[in-house]
């Protein structure tokens, strides 16, 4: 994969105008850079030294800081030179050209690969470094730092060592069966230890993908009928004008995305086409995409128009205005759902089953009225924690207290008058904390690669049966330990290493 005998170099900072640019050199001959740039000063290890850098013709290139990290006490475990020069494109280009005369340009992730090969980090720590570089929010950085500190490595190494200990006992029986395997108590201890590991790995896998979600971002979709304020809310949360806002219904056809930070959590916010009946094939495609994205989302913000109708009963009791009754109920056409639902003023008492999505889906399917199913029903989830219900355009609302229907909270908001917006943001943060597992100290799986190996390890352990032939027992334990070792990189599998390090930038 790489020739570690070569001395490599690369720009470690972004190429462009900046105050400082850092160029890293690593390898057995890194100190040759001193002679190449005609540096005469004594360079003390781990001290910053101001030097002048000259080219082959003794022309001054720049002055900057040089730091020497002798092996093995460096990032890569090799001799490392770091040059800190002015962040000028011209200076950077000249220095890189000079270095290419004596060294080899590093491949993406090659510095980190050498650090791994020299035992400075395990694979999960290396991946943590990549995640920290990519982190855009506080919580992403916090998770990456935990991984760099060796949190996952310690957990998986402990499990792997326990398996190796069990396997050593079984291997001993193969050589000396009369000494060990005859004791029933020893059999029970081994079986209990394996079952304990099975339970621990199962619990580790049943984490609702918290770590992966935090790395990738929580997918939130804004849904609702046309012209209910979806794009206005989208632009407000994104803090910039991305979607076109118009009084004409159906402006948004395709899905728009924005990456935002709410309370330190990464959010991928999507604005979608309004859900309605249409004969326009382009709009229908947009509606289809909206429903699909809503189904796949981690969280939905579902909008209904408030449209104040001077409902005295609402002002007095907090009940929802009749117009919203109509808005919500019209999906249940021609008494296919519940006659009580269609009665204006019913206020969705216990007879109303609108908020039971699975019930709506089944009932509408029985009566062949799929076109009337709202997007909330098409999501096919009965977990109301996955949806935030919002009454939009509530410009005339007296207060921003939640309105309850059948125990479901609907939040009135007005972007124009900034009513309920802070409450909505707080609610999104609360939902994100629930999804990500706020402030949990338990190590979490952060990549699909980890999850795949853990699943395979679990499969081998679940096949463990103390009554099986001893050779099969030993093989299952060996394979389970192999999968755990693959996560942290104890085994030498080039496909795994290529997959991990190919995603790094050059210079890291």
Curated annotation (Swiss-Prot):
The GO annotation for biological process reads: tRNA methylation; tRNA wobble uridine modification
What superkingdom heads the lineage?
A: Bacteria
Tell me its family. Belongs to the TRAFAC class TrmE-Era-EngA-EngB-Septin-like GTPase superfamily. TrmE GTPase family.
Report quaternary structure and partners: Homodimer. Heterotetramer of two MnmE and two MnmG subunits.
S-S pairs: none
Q: What is this protein called?
A: tRNA modification GTPase MnmE
Q: Cite the Pfam families for this sequence.
A: MMR_HSR1, MnmE_helical, TrmE_N
Cofactor(s), names only, from the UniProt record: K(+)
Q: Tell me which species this is from.
A: Wolbachia pipientis wMel
- Catalytic activity, EC: 3.6.-.-
This chain's function reads: Exhibits a very high intrinsic GTPase hydrolysis rate. Involved in the addition of a carboxymethylaminomethyl (cmnm) group at the wobble position (U34) of certain tRNAs, forming tRNA-cmnm(5)s(2)U34.
Q: Where does (6S)-5-formyl-5,6,7,8-tetrahydrofolate bind?
A: 24, 82, 120, 508
Q: Which GO terms describe its cellular component?
A: cytoplasm
Sites binding GTP sit at 227-232, 246-252, 271-274
Q: Name one GO molecular function term.
A: GTP binding
Keyword Hydrolase attached: yes
Keywords (alphabetical) are: Cytoplasm, GTP-binding, Hydrolase, Magnesium, Metal-binding, Nucleotide-binding, Potassium, tRNA processing
Q: How is the cofactor bound?
A: Binds 1 potassium ion per subunit.
The top EC class, named as a word, is hydrolase
- State the coiled-coil residue ranges: none
Localization per Swiss-Prot or TrEMBL: Cytoplasm
Question: Where, by residue number, does Mg(2+) bind?
Answer: 231, 252
- The TrmE-type G domain covers 217-433
């Amino acid at each position: 994969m790489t020739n570690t005998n070569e001395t490599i170099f690369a720009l470690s900072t972004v190429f462009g105008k900046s105050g400082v640019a850092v160029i890293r050199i690593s390898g057995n001959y890194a100190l040759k850079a001193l002679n190449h740039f005609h540096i005469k000063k004594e360079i003390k290890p781990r001290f910053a030294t101001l030097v002048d850098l000259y080219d082959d013709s003794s022309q001054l290139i720049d002055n900057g800081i040089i730091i020497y990290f002798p092996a093995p006490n460096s990032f890569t475990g090799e001799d490392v030179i770091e040059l800190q020069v002015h962040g000028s494109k011209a200076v950077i280009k000249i220095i890189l050209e000079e270095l290419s005369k004596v060294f080899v340009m590093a491949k993406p992730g090659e510095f980190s690969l050498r650090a791994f090969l020299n035992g400075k980090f395990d694979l999960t720590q290396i991946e943590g470094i990549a995640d920290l570089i990519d982190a855009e929010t506080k919580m992403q950085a916090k998770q990456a730092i935990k991984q760099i500190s060796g949190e996952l490595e310690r957990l998986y190494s402990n499990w792997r060592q326990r398996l190796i200990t069990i396997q050593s006992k079984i291997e001993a029986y193969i050589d000396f069966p009369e000494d060990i395997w005859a004791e029933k108590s020893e059999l029970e201890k081994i079986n209990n230890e394996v079952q304990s590991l099975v339970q621990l790995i199962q619990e580790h896998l049943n984490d609702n993908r918290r770590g992966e979600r935090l790395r990738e971002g929580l997918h939130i979709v804004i849904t609702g009928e046309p012209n209910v304020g979806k794009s206005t809310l989208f632009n407000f949360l994104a803090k910039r004008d991305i979607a076109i806002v118009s009084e004409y219904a159906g402006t948004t056809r395709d899905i728009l995305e924005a990456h935002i930070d709410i309370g330190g959590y990464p959010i991928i916010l999507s604005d979608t086409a309004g859900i309605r009946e249409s004969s326009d094939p382009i709009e229908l495609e947009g509606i289809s995409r909206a429903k699909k994205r809503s189904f796949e989302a981690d969280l939905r913000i579902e909008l209904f128009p408030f449209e104040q109708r001077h409902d005295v009963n609402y002002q007095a009791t907090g009940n929802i205005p009749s117009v919203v009754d109509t808005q919500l109920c019209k999906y249940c056409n021609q008494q296919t759902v519940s006659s009580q639902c269609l009665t204006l003023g019913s206020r969705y008492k216990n007879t109303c089953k609108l908020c039971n999505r699975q019930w709506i889906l089944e009932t509408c399917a029985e009566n062949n009225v799929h076109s009337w199913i709202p997007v909330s029903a098409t999501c096919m989830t009965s977990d109301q924690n996955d949806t935030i219900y919002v009454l939009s355009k509530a410009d005339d609302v007296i207060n921003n207290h939640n309105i309850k229907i059948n125990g479901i909270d609907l939040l009135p908001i007005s972007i124009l008058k900034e009513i309920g917006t802070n409450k909505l943001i707080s609610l999104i943060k609360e939902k994100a904390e629930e999804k990500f597992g706020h402030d949990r100290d338990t190590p979490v799986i952060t990549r699909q690669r980890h999850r795949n190996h853990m699943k395979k390890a679990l499969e081998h352990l679940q096949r463990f049966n103390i009554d099986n032939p001893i050779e099969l027992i030993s093989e299952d334990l060996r394979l389970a330990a192999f999968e755990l070792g693959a996560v942290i990189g104890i085994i030498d599998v080039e496909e795994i290493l290529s997959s991990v390090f190919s995603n790094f930038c050059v210079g890291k």
